[in-house]
Amino acid sequence: MYNPSQAVPVSLHKNQDNQDGGQQRSHYPQISSQQSQSYLSVPSIGTPSFGSVGSVSSLAPGSSFIPPSPMAPLTPATPASSESSGIVPQLQNIVSTVNLNCRLDLKKIALHARNAEYNPKRFAAVIMRIREPRTTALIFSSGKMVCTGAKREDNSRLAARKYARVVQKLGFAAKFLDFKIQNMVGSCDVKFPIRLEGLVLTHGQFSSYEPELFPGLIYRMVKPRIVLLIFVSGKVVLTGAKVRQEIYDAFNNIYPILKSFKKTS
């Protein structure tokens, strides 16, 4: 049981404590550890995690790790005992890239390939489409190719191979190198309206909401590194994932938060 008389303020500078003969001093009022956590925690989402690197959202890429201070942005934590939503986000689009490892004559490809268009004044790539899997490819003269529109990882790879085969049949020494999924987009519906104004006020360091410019709230999750578009109707779009599990983890993290801001009629 907590005893106020046992609360001992901790100095912010250990060297100063040693110079004062072991006596600890603090310029701040005495508060318990339980109170300090309540001041620093993000409301309605449980106790924030101080131990993960993701809790320092302002950490620049490539910089050395800095232990999070009490004033550093915190990663909202999902309560461990949160109820399961039973909702599984569905993948809507997968963007992948591949290197054909050869220079390409885009005019020749556009003239001889089916379902291909090329307008260099508008876009410096051939736009090619196939029906199965239903996808679109952007083919650049450098040999780089972007494949978009697939809804499964294996379909994205299969489509990219089909485009590479089309280029090979036109006489180019195309190879299939460095295939990589760059982005996954998923969506779902939580089936209840959401108070976006309250959400942006409580989670302002992670979200932005300007209904005059865009009707959805943009929530930038730190871990996993996913961007969510949250609409008042309850529709949620998740983007920025490299693997499918990141979509699922991000939704499991955000669902208890959305439920706490459910509109009540």
From Swiss-Prot:
Sequence repeat ranges, renumbered to this chain: 91-167, 181-258
A Gene Ontology cellular-component term: nucleus
One MF annotation (Gene Ontology) recorded for this entry: RNA polymerase II general transcription initiation factor activity
Region ranges (Disordered): 1-40
One Gene Ontology term from the biological process aspect of the record: DNA-templated transcription initiation
Biased composition annotated in UniProt, kind: Polar residues: 18-29
Alphabetized UniProt keyword annotations: DNA-binding, Nucleus, Repeat, Transcription
Keyword Repeat: yes
UniProt-listed PROSITE patterns: TFIID
Function recorded in the entry: General transcription factor that functions at the core of the DNA-binding multiprotein factor TFIID. Binding of TFIID to the TATA box is the initial transcriptional step of the pre-initiation complex (PIC), playing a role in the activation of eukaryotic genes transcribed by RNA polymerase II.
Subunit structure: Belongs to the TFIID complex together with the TBP-associated factors (TAFs). Binds DNA as monomer.
Designated name of the protein: TATA-box-binding protein
The organism of origin for this protein: Strongylocentrotus purpuratus
